[in-house]
A protein has these predicted regions:
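N-terminal helical capping/dimerization or prosegment-like subdomains
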Residues: 2-98, 328, 345
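Fold-level recognition of mixed alpha/beta catalytic cores in primary-metabolism enzymes, strongest
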Residues: 124-289, 298-305, 414, 438-444
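An extended, acidic, His-containing surface patch that forms the Zn2+-binding/catalytic region
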Residues: 79, 193, 251-328, 340-349, ...
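Short small-residue beta-strand/loop micro-motif enriched in glycine and branched aliphatics
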Residues: 117-121, 217-223, 318-319, 434-436
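A common structural junction motif
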Residues: 90-91, 243-247, 351-361
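A generic structural motif
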Residues: 126, 217, 336-342, 372
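Oligomerization/assembly interface segments of phage tail-like spikes and tubes
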Residues: 209-212, 327-335
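Active-site metal-coordination/substrate-binding segment of hydrolases
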Residues: 81-157, 448
Length: 462
């Protein structure tokens, strides 16, 4: 067997013990958005440092004002080998609503779901602990067979991706010389379908905002004050309802500055993928497309901007009933950006729009929650071509190059601050329920994900 075949065989042999290691990491409740889990986030970072040390990496926990980073270096490859920076995140989303989980979210398991499929269940299986471990386990297989890796490898794992990555930019600035590589590898994306791997070449940007409207200085009796006193819930929902017009377009002033129409040849290539609104929405129990009228579901999710209300609350929400007019109402709103839309300009447009809707005797405050521009990568870069061929050798169907509706701010940071383009490869599926109860990761995604990184590292080094 060739070296790569021997490494692939070792990855297969290691699968059972690899799952045991993954489950150890999954049991750590590294929820970055909740301060109550600060110690768990550090525990996850320390676990990763300990494990990477067994693979020959020089690894360390790096403190930040928030949750720590993990940085590791493996210099076993030759000096002229390509240098790659692999990025992932060990933090996870909260598990609410806990009552909707079929199992303990932090007690992972393997489930047989029929038709030859098995899934890994638990928070972080797909986003992103399972994904990052595919790369780490590929490194393990190489070390056990060759004693070295085919590329020089630096690893960066962060613990605040799910909470807006507030410490990431300062950390990159302070450690740019140490972290700079030939290119970055990012494993926080997904497959096109169960048999078709994908490389994402475009990502939407993101702006997050929390808005709080305050009316009276306390909750009011709705019988005594109803009809006379301002109701902040009414004010807020009316303002938010006006974010879209009847055609689905967003009404903020200047919102579409920097948004270009998708070229016809690109739209034609997307049409060949066979993804209809019905098939796309049917996976989540819906059937009628929303958003801008007259556009395909792939254009809407890959190439058009959005405004979404992610949460809204105010007044009494407990058991039973309480007739009050709330003193405050709050919402969290996110915008996905495309083209050259400016996150700062979008944030200002939203704040101006909401502020203009607030009565004179009420007040409004805003809290930012991250902001990053859209990213476009070259469709014909040599790195992308090598990875595409390597993935095609592993999976039943050839790899494809796609857009991506989500945001990975680190990709823009790598490009802007370290001068590196990123290869975006992941093995999640659209039904993995990331950020939702009953998150899962296909066993074949994990297994073939490891094998895929074995092939990609070999291809990059060739």
């Amino acid at each position: 067997m060739t070296d790569v075949q021997q490494v692939l065989a070792r990855a297969d042999q290691n699968l059972s013990t690899s799952l045991e290691r993954l489950f150890e990491l999954l049991r750590i409740q590294s929820i970055s958005t909740d301060p109550a889990y600060k110690a768990e986030c550090r525990k996850a970072a320390e676990w990763l440092v300990g494990y990477l040390g067994t693979l020959g990496f020089t690894a360390s926990v790096r403190d930040t004002p928030g949750h720590p980073m993990v940085v590791a270096h493996h210099a076993g490859a030759s000096a002229d080998a390509p240098h790659v920076l692999f990025y992932g995140h060990y933090d996870v989303q909260p598990v609410d609503p806990i009552e909707l989980w079929e199992n303990d979210p932090f007690e992972p398991s393997i489930k047989d779901v029929g038709e030859g499929r098995k899934i890994l269940t638990g928070r972080g299986t797909s986003d992103d602990k399972g994904q990052l471990m595919t790369f780490v386990e590929a490194c393990r297989a190489y070390k056990e067979i060759n004693g070295a890796l085919p590329c020089r490898v630096t690893i960066l794992f962060e613990g605040e991706e799910e909470s807006g990555s507030p410490s990431l930019k300062p950390f990159l600035e302070a450690n740019a010389a140490e972290l700079k590589a030939d290119y970055a590898l990012v494993c926080d994306t997904g497959m096109w379908d169960r048999d078709t791997p994908a490389i994402a070449a475009a990502l939407r940007g993101l702006v997050g905002e929390e808005v709080i409207v305050t009316a009276a200085d306390r909750d009011l009796h709705s019988g005594l004050f109803g009809g006379a006193a301002a109701n902040p819930i009414h004010i807020l929902v009316e303002a938010l309802a006006g974010l879209h017009d009847e055609t689905g377009r967003i009404t903020l002033d200047g919102f579409y500055d920097g948004v270009e129409e998708t070229p016809d040849n690109i739209k034609a290539s997307w049409e060949t993928l066979g993804k209809t609104a019905e098939s796309f929405l049917g996976e989540v129990g819906l059937s009628i497309p929303s958003g801008e009228k007259g556009r395909s579901v792939l254009e809407l999710t890959w190439a058009r901007p959005t405004a979404e209300i992610n949460g809204i609350w105010g007044g009494y929400t407990g058991e039973g009933f309480k007739t009050v007019i709330a003193a405050k109402a709050s919402a969290k709103v996110s915008f996905r950006l495309v083209g050259t839309q400016d996150p700062a300009a979008i944030r200002e447009a939203f704040r101006s729009y909401i502020s203009a809707k607030i009565p004179a005797d009420c007040s409004v405050e805003f809290h930012p929650h991250g902001g990053s521009p859209a990213i476009h990568l070259s469709y014909d870069s040599p790195v992308l071509t090598k990875a595409k061929n390597a993935l095609s050798d592993e999976w039943p169907k050839p790899a494809i190059v796609i857009g991506m509706g989500g945001s990975i701010p680190i990709v823009g940071d790598f490009q802007k601050m370290l001068g590196m383009e990123s290869l975006l490869v992941g093995f999640g599926l659209s039904d993995d329920r990331i950020h939702s109860p009953n998150e899962k990761y296909e066993l074949v995604s994990y297994h073939k994900g490891i094998r895929s990184w074995v092939r990609i590292l070999q291809a990059l080094a060739a």
